[in-house]
């Protein structure tokens, strides 16, 4: 015999799977980290319905232009969840956003995050937001607000997803981009720290699936003694702070390309006008003039990827590409070195149709 539920029994939000008290604990756990990212323009603190940021500093610009961006971390999060390591994916989130607006020459001003979880756990959220705060400190933007959403019945309890939103500013006469690029310009690359935050569906398929956590934490000779877990979760390099400092120091950079999903092939072309190509020197059998991170080679070999497919999937060791006048290469390289970067020449600009081509000569 079946019985119906007591129609007089109270069913709370907690009964439905949403823990308001845990949400309050999570907010308390992140306040200190968020406070470390503040800027003078921030008005008020956490807890308001909206976040206020003074525009007074923009008065010194000739024509201030706001630049916005949004992104996520993708399926790299599934590996973080598998390994129960949550302290670096927030840094990835910030990197993916701020380094998408710096190619216009924009300074990131403030950042907001969206954290969706199956079941809210204050400690895990604190780790995630701690990473976001670290990324904001590195890029110089303020973490002014965000949203934590608990999705019981929609997401598994241990699952979460992240989205980030950044707003920056650039003076209109100083906007960088394809219209400044000319034939004969040189392409400089800045090293990546590894896979960064793109290509992880392939990484998981060929290098992660079927392995235990213990196996993933074992040192591998192919990775120079590093474990696969450490290699694939290494945080994405944040270039914004150093590049903006270089621009303020007078580095005459014409255009930039953030090398993310689609690799060099599908990103460097975004810095080109329609009548020019970017010729990248892959160096033939000897390989390029820069270092390809071992983890990228490891995954590419596991997937039997052709060279062309590698260059349209992974960053291949280039996290950011810059286009500069041939006569300015040495000066720009020196300024970049002063900011801690190790720039290298990776190609040149030639007549074409707005695409990336490869020179594979030895």
Which residues does each predicted region cover?
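Glycine-rich phosphate/pyrophosphate-binding loop regions near the starts of catalytic domains
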Residues: 32-193, 279
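Short, glycine-/Ser/Thr-/acidic-enriched flexible segments
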Residues: 58, 72-73, 167-171, 193-195, ...
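Residue-level signature of catalytic and energy-coupling elements of molecular machines
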Residues: 19, 71, 184, 258, ...
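Buried hydrophobic packing segments
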Residues: 30, 52, 97-98, 203-206, ...
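Glycine-/charge-enriched secondary-structure boundary and capping motifs
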Residues: 3-4, 8-15, 124-142, 155-162, ...
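Hydrophobic face of alpha-helices
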Residues: 27, 126-129, 200
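Short, acidic (Asp/Glu-rich) active-site segment that either coordinates a divalent metal cofactor
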Residues: 70, 161, 174-228, 265
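N-terminal amphipathic/basic leader segments beginning at the initiator methionine
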Residues: 2-41
């Amino acid at each position: 015999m079946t019985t119906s539920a007591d129609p007089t029994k109270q069913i709370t939000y907690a009964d439905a799977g949403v823990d308001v008290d845990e949400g309050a604990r999570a907010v308390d756990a992140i306040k200190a980290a968020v406070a470390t990212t503040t800027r003078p323009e921030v008005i008020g603190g956490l807890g308001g319905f909206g976040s206020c940021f003074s525009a007074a500093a923009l008065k010194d610009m000739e024509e201030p232009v706001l630049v916005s961006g949004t992104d996520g971390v993708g399926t790299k999060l599934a590996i973080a969840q598998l390994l129960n390591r949550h302290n670096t994916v927030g840094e990835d989130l910030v990197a993916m956003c701020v380094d998408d607006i710096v190619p216009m020459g924009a300074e990131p001003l403030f950042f907001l995050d969206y954290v969706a979880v199956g079941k809210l756990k204050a400690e895990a959220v604190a780790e995630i937001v701690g990473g976001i705060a670290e990324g904001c400190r590195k890029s110089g933007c303020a973490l002014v607000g965000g949203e934590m959403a608990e999705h019981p019945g929609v997401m598994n309890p241990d699952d979460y997803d992240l989205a980030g939103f950044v707003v920056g500013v650039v003076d209109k006469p100083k906007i960088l981009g394809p219209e400044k690029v000319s034939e004969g310009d040189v392409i400089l690359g800045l090293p990546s720290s590894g896979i960064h935050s793109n290509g992880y569906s392939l990484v998981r398929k060929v290098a992660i699936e079927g392995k235990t956590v213990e196996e993933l934490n074992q040192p591998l000779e192919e990775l120079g003694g590093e474990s696969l877990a450490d290699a694939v979760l290494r945080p994405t390099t944040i270039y914004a702070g150093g590049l903006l400092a270089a621009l303020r120091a007078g580095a005459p950079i014409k255009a930039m390309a953030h090398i993310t999903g689609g690799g060099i092939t599908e990103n460097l072309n975004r810095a080109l006008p329609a009548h020019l190509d970017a010729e990248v020197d892959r160096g033939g059998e000897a390989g390029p003039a820069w270092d390809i991170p071992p983890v990228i080679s490891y995954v590419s070999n596991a997937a039997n990827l052709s060279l062309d497919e590698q260059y349209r999937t992974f960053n291949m060791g280039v996290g950011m590409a810059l286009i500069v006048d041939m006569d300015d290469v040495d000066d720009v390289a020196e300024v970049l070195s002063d900011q801690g970067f190790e720039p290298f020449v990776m190609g040149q600009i030639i007549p074409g149709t707005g695409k990336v081509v490869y020179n594979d000569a030895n």
